[in-house]
Amino acid sequence: MSTATSPRVLNHPAREDIRLGPVLHALSDPVRLRIVRAMARGAGEEFSCSYFALPVTKSTCTHHFRVLRESGVLRQTYQGTAKMNSLRRADLDALFPGLLDSVLAAADAQADRLGEELPAQGG
Amino acid sequence: MSTATSPRVLNHPAREDIRLGPVLHALSDPVRLRIVRAMARGAGEEFSCSYFALPVTKSTCTHHFRVLRESGVLRQTYQGTAKMNSLRRADLDALFPGLLDSVLAAADAQADRLGEELPAQGG
Protein backbone atom coordinates (compact mmCIF):
# COMPACT_ATOMS: atom_id res chain seq x y z
CA MET A 1 0.00 0.00 0.00
CA SER A 2 1.38 3.38 -0.91
CA THR A 3 1.70 6.03 1.72
CA ALA A 4 1.06 9.73 1.56
CA THR A 5 4.76 10.40 1.83
CA SER A 6 6.29 12.06 -1.23
CA PRO A 7 9.20 10.38 -2.97
CA ARG A 8 12.28 11.18 -0.96
CA VAL A 9 14.55 11.72 -3.89
CA LEU A 10 14.28 15.20 -5.38
CA ASN A 11 15.99 15.62 -8.74
CA HIS A 12 18.05 18.73 -9.26
CA PRO A 13 20.15 19.59 -12.30
CA ALA A 14 23.85 19.96 -11.56
CA ARG A 15 25.10 23.50 -12.12
CA GLU A 16 26.54 22.61 -15.52
CA ASP A 17 23.23 21.14 -16.63
CA ILE A 18 21.18 24.27 -15.91
CA ARG A 19 19.97 25.84 -19.16
CA LEU A 20 18.80 29.36 -19.87
CA GLY A 21 15.55 28.38 -21.60
CA PRO A 22 14.07 26.40 -18.70
CA VAL A 23 15.22 29.10 -16.24
CA LEU A 24 13.44 31.83 -18.22
CA HIS A 25 10.40 29.61 -18.58
CA ALA A 26 10.38 28.99 -14.81
CA LEU A 27 10.58 32.73 -14.15
CA SER A 28 7.92 33.63 -16.76
CA ASP A 29 5.00 32.53 -14.58
CA PRO A 30 3.67 35.21 -12.21
CA VAL A 31 3.22 32.82 -9.28
CA ARG A 32 6.69 31.36 -9.68
CA LEU A 33 8.17 34.81 -10.01
CA ARG A 34 6.48 35.81 -6.75
CA ILE A 35 8.06 32.84 -5.03
CA VAL A 36 11.50 33.74 -6.37
CA ARG A 37 11.11 37.41 -5.41
CA ALA A 38 10.12 36.46 -1.88
CA MET A 39 13.06 34.07 -1.58
CA ALA A 40 15.48 36.64 -2.98
CA ARG A 41 14.51 39.02 -0.19
CA GLY A 42 15.68 36.44 2.36
CA ALA A 43 19.03 35.66 0.77
CA GLY A 44 20.43 32.28 1.67
CA GLU A 45 17.59 31.31 3.92
CA GLU A 46 15.39 28.28 3.55
CA PHE A 47 11.65 28.51 3.34
CA SER A 48 8.88 25.99 3.69
CA CYS A 49 6.11 26.05 1.09
CA SER A 50 3.71 27.47 3.66
CA TYR A 51 5.91 30.56 4.01
CA PHE A 52 4.58 31.73 0.67
CA ALA A 53 0.99 32.89 0.89
CA LEU A 54 0.03 31.99 -2.65
CA PRO A 55 -3.41 32.29 -4.25
CA VAL A 56 -3.27 28.74 -5.64
CA THR A 57 -4.13 25.23 -4.49
CA LYS A 58 -1.55 23.07 -2.78
CA SER A 59 -1.15 20.86 -5.85
CA THR A 60 -0.59 23.87 -8.09
CA CYS A 61 1.91 25.18 -5.57
CA THR A 62 3.71 21.82 -5.63
CA HIS A 63 3.80 21.98 -9.43
CA HIS A 64 5.32 25.46 -9.42
CA PHE A 65 8.02 24.44 -6.95
CA ARG A 66 8.82 21.40 -9.07
CA VAL A 67 9.24 23.58 -12.20
CA LEU A 68 11.52 25.89 -10.24
CA ARG A 69 13.54 22.96 -8.89
CA GLU A 70 13.86 21.07 -12.17
CA SER A 71 14.99 24.19 -14.02
CA GLY A 72 17.69 24.82 -11.41
CA VAL A 73 16.23 27.99 -9.91
CA LEU A 74 15.81 26.59 -6.43
CA ARG A 75 16.88 23.67 -4.31
CA GLN A 76 14.39 21.62 -2.31
CA THR A 77 15.46 19.49 0.61
CA TYR A 78 13.52 17.49 3.14
CA GLN A 79 13.66 18.47 6.76
CA GLY A 80 11.56 15.74 8.32
CA THR A 81 8.45 15.64 6.17
CA ALA A 82 8.62 19.30 5.14
CA LYS A 83 10.28 20.43 1.93
CA MET A 84 12.52 23.43 2.46
CA ASN A 85 13.40 25.67 -0.46
CA SER A 86 16.43 27.80 -1.16
CA LEU A 87 17.31 29.90 -4.16
CA ARG A 88 20.30 28.64 -6.19
CA ARG A 89 21.66 32.12 -6.52
CA ALA A 90 25.35 31.13 -6.57
CA ASP A 91 24.72 28.68 -9.40
CA LEU A 92 22.60 31.11 -11.40
CA ASP A 93 25.00 34.01 -10.88
CA ALA A 94 27.95 31.86 -11.93
CA LEU A 95 26.25 30.67 -15.11
CA PHE A 96 24.35 33.83 -16.05
CA PRO A 97 25.92 36.85 -14.35
CA GLY A 98 23.41 39.59 -13.68
CA LEU A 99 20.43 37.70 -15.08
CA LEU A 100 18.61 36.96 -11.85
CA ASP A 101 19.20 40.48 -10.56
CA SER A 102 17.86 42.04 -13.74
CA VAL A 103 14.76 39.84 -13.67
CA LEU A 104 14.16 40.73 -10.01
CA ALA A 105 14.66 44.42 -10.77
CA ALA A 106 12.28 44.17 -13.73
CA ALA A 107 9.68 42.48 -11.53
CA ASP A 108 10.07 45.19 -8.88
CA ALA A 109 9.77 47.93 -11.50
CA GLN A 110 6.66 46.37 -12.98
CA ALA A 111 5.06 45.87 -9.56
CA ASP A 112 5.73 49.53 -8.71
CA ARG A 113 4.30 50.64 -12.03
CA LEU A 114 1.17 48.54 -11.68
CA GLY A 115 0.76 49.20 -7.96
CA GLU A 116 1.15 45.53 -7.09
CA GLU A 117 2.63 44.27 -3.88
CA LEU A 118 4.06 40.96 -2.86
CA PRO A 119 1.42 39.00 -1.00
CA ALA A 120 1.57 38.97 2.77
CA GLN A 121 3.72 36.12 3.95
CA GLY A 122 2.20 33.17 5.74
CA GLY A 123 3.10 32.11 9.24
CA MET B 1 -13.10 33.19 -51.14
CA SER B 2 -10.20 33.83 -48.85
CA THR B 3 -6.81 34.63 -50.26
CA ALA B 4 -3.39 33.52 -49.12
CA THR B 5 -2.68 37.02 -47.89
CA SER B 6 -2.23 37.30 -44.12
CA PRO B 7 -4.41 39.70 -42.18
CA ARG B 8 -2.94 43.15 -42.63
CA VAL B 9 -3.44 44.27 -39.08
CA LEU B 10 -0.69 43.12 -36.76
CA ASN B 11 -1.43 43.59 -33.08
CA HIS B 12 1.32 44.95 -30.89
CA PRO B 13 1.09 45.80 -27.21
CA ALA B 14 1.75 49.45 -26.42
CA ARG B 15 4.87 49.96 -24.35
CA GLU B 16 2.87 50.34 -21.15
CA ASP B 17 1.06 47.06 -21.82
CA ILE B 18 4.21 44.97 -22.16
CA ARG B 19 4.54 42.57 -19.22
CA LEU B 20 7.57 40.77 -17.86
CA GLY B 21 5.98 37.30 -17.80
CA PRO B 22 5.14 37.12 -21.52
CA VAL B 23 8.54 38.63 -22.39
CA LEU B 24 10.38 35.96 -20.39
CA HIS B 25 8.13 33.29 -21.86
CA ALA B 26 8.88 34.56 -25.38
CA LEU B 27 12.61 34.47 -24.68
CA SER B 28 12.51 31.02 -23.03
CA ASP B 29 12.21 29.14 -26.32
CA PRO B 30 15.54 28.29 -28.01
CA VAL B 31 14.32 29.15 -31.51
CA ARG B 32 12.85 32.47 -30.41
CA LEU B 33 15.99 33.29 -28.48
CA ARG B 34 18.05 32.61 -31.62
CA ILE B 35 15.89 35.07 -33.53
CA VAL B 36 16.31 37.72 -30.85
CA ARG B 37 20.07 37.18 -30.65
CA ALA B 38 20.43 37.52 -34.40
CA MET B 39 18.33 40.69 -34.39
CA ALA B 40 20.28 42.17 -31.49
CA ARG B 41 23.46 41.82 -33.51
CA GLY B 42 21.96 44.11 -36.17
CA ALA B 43 20.72 46.82 -33.84
CA GLY B 44 17.88 48.88 -35.24
CA GLU B 45 17.73 47.10 -38.54
CA GLU B 46 14.72 45.34 -39.97
CA PHE B 47 14.83 41.74 -41.03
CA SER B 48 12.56 39.59 -43.12
CA CYS B 49 11.67 36.14 -41.80
CA SER B 50 13.86 34.53 -44.44
CA TYR B 51 16.89 36.30 -42.97
CA PHE B 52 16.79 33.81 -40.13
CA ALA B 53 17.90 30.36 -41.21
CA LEU B 54 15.81 28.44 -38.73
CA PRO B 55 15.49 24.67 -38.44
CA VAL B 56 11.68 24.81 -38.30
CA THR B 57 8.78 24.84 -40.73
CA LYS B 58 7.38 28.10 -42.04
CA SER B 59 4.25 27.79 -39.94
CA THR B 60 6.30 27.17 -36.80
CA CYS B 61 8.43 30.16 -37.70
CA THR B 62 5.29 32.28 -38.10
CA HIS B 63 4.11 31.10 -34.69
CA HIS B 64 7.39 32.06 -33.03
CA PHE B 65 7.33 35.53 -34.57
CA ARG B 66 3.76 36.00 -33.41
CA VAL B 67 4.71 35.08 -29.82
CA LEU B 68 7.60 37.55 -29.99
CA ARG B 69 5.34 40.26 -31.41
CA GLU B 70 2.43 39.75 -29.03
CA SER B 71 4.73 39.79 -26.01
CA GLY B 72 6.25 43.09 -27.15
CA VAL B 73 9.73 41.78 -27.95
CA LEU B 74 9.63 42.72 -31.62
CA ARG B 75 7.65 44.79 -34.04
CA GLN B 76 6.41 43.38 -37.34
CA THR B 77 5.46 45.61 -40.21
CA TYR B 78 4.43 44.88 -43.76
CA GLN B 79 6.63 46.06 -46.57
CA GLY B 80 4.61 44.97 -49.58
CA THR B 81 3.70 41.38 -48.79
CA ALA B 82 6.77 40.71 -46.67
CA LYS B 83 6.74 41.05 -42.88
CA MET B 84 9.76 42.92 -41.60
CA ASN B 85 10.85 42.51 -37.98
CA SER B 86 12.63 44.83 -35.62
CA LEU B 87 13.56 44.40 -31.99
CA ARG B 88 11.70 46.70 -29.57
CA ARG B 89 14.89 47.39 -27.68
CA ALA B 90 13.98 50.95 -26.65
CA ASP B 91 10.67 49.79 -25.19
CA LEU B 92 12.21 46.83 -23.39
CA ASP B 93 15.15 48.85 -22.06
CA ALA B 94 12.81 51.57 -20.80
CA LEU B 95 10.56 49.11 -18.99
CA PHE B 96 13.15 46.61 -17.80
CA PRO B 97 16.61 48.23 -17.77
CA GLY B 98 19.37 45.72 -18.36
CA LEU B 99 17.07 42.74 -18.78
CA LEU B 100 17.49 42.17 -22.50
CA ASP B 101 21.25 42.66 -22.30
CA SER B 102 21.57 40.18 -19.45
CA VAL B 103 19.49 37.59 -21.32
CA LEU B 104 21.61 38.09 -24.46
CA ALA B 105 24.82 37.82 -22.41
CA ALA B 106 23.50 34.67 -20.73
CA ALA B 107 22.66 33.18 -24.13
CA ASP B 108 26.13 34.02 -25.44
CA ALA B 109 27.78 32.53 -22.35
CA GLN B 110 25.75 29.35 -22.66
CA ALA B 111 26.46 29.03 -26.38
CA ASP B 112 30.18 29.43 -25.69
CA ARG B 113 30.04 26.86 -22.92
CA LEU B 114 28.16 24.33 -25.03
CA GLY B 115 30.06 25.07 -28.24
CA GLU B 116 26.94 26.23 -30.04
CA GLU B 117 26.91 28.82 -32.77
CA LEU B 118 24.17 30.93 -34.20
CA PRO B 119 22.89 29.32 -37.39
CA ALA B 120 24.18 30.59 -40.67
CA GLN B 121 22.01 33.40 -41.88
CA GLY B 122 19.82 32.96 -44.94
CA GLY B 123 20.06 34.99 -48.10
Question: Language-model segments: what does each one mean?
Answer:
Chain A
Residues 21-57, 79-91:
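N-terminal helix-turn-helix DNA-binding core of bacterial DNA-binding proteins
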Residues 50-74:
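Canonical helix-turn-helix DNA-binding module
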Residues 5-9, 25, 34, 38-41, ...:
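N-proximal short alpha-helices
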Residues 2-19, 37-41, 89-123:
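Amphipathic alpha-helical dimerization/coiled-coil segments
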Residues 29, 64, 97:
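Conserved acidic functional residues
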Residues 1-2, 80:
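N-terminal cationic amphipathic segment used for targeting or macromolecule association
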Residues 74, 85, 107:
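A short beta-strand-loop micro-motif that forms or neighbors metal/cofactor-
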